[in-house]
Structures are given as C-alpha cells and as structure tokens.
C-alpha cells in the first residue's frame, strides 16, 4: 500500500491548481534584476530583453511568457553567475508552468 507523503506534489497535466506560475515568474525576474544590477553582468542580449520586457504602450508581455521564450538564456545566465536558487526556481517553472 503506498504511503501518503506530506510533501507538496503538483501536476500541471491534472490541474494548475496550487501552482503559482505568475508569482514564481515574478520571483525569477527579481533574481534576474538583482544579478543584472551588479556591474559587468549585463550584455547586449539582456539590454534587448529589458526593452522587450518593458513592452509598448499597447501591450506588455507577461513574465512567464518571457521566461518561457528565453528559457535557455535564463539558464545559461544563472549558471554563469552560480545562482543556484534562481536555477532551482527556473527548473520548477519549466516543469510546472511551461
């Protein structure tokens, strides 16, 4: 007989209930903002990304869409700067929300 685990288990294929995709995406962007505020960490790509993130008067893309669209760049950036907390959160977002 399987034992019940008190740990949180989510399954996006059953329901997005109890998965805070928007909040997790916002937290990951906070990690990105902290890293990019350190001199020497921004690149031409991240400057371009900041413009996309700001959006236009007509529309502003949401954080989850931007993460999903640039997931490999996020992974490479956080690996480069050894941000294990951001990498863990990125993996969680990828598995639960993308």
From Swiss-Prot:
GO BP, one annotated term: nitrogen fixation
UniProt keyword annotations, A-Z: Nitrogen fixation
Signal sequence range: none
Record-linked InterPro entries: CowN
Coiled-coil residue windows: none
The protein's role, per its UniProt record: Is required to sustain N(2)-dependent growth in the presence of low levels of carbon monoxide (CO). Probably acts by protecting the N(2) fixation ability of the nitrogenase complex, which is inactivated in the presence of CO.
Family listed: Belongs to the CowN family.
Name of the molecule in the record: N(2)-fixation sustaining protein CowN
Gene label: cowN
């Amino acid at each position: 007989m399987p034992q019940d685990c008190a740990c949180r288990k989510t399954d996006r294929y059953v329901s997005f209930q109890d998965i805070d995709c928007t909040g997790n995406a916002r937290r990951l962007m906070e990690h990105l903002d902290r890293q990019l505020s350190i001199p020497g960490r921004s690149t031409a790509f991240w400057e371009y990304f900041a413009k996309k993130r700001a959006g236009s008067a007509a529309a502003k893309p949401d954080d989850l869409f931007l993460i999903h669209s640039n997931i490999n760049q996020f992974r490479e950036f956080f690996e480069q700067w050894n941000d294990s907390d951001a990498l863990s959160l990125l993996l969680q977002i990828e598995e639960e929300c993308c």
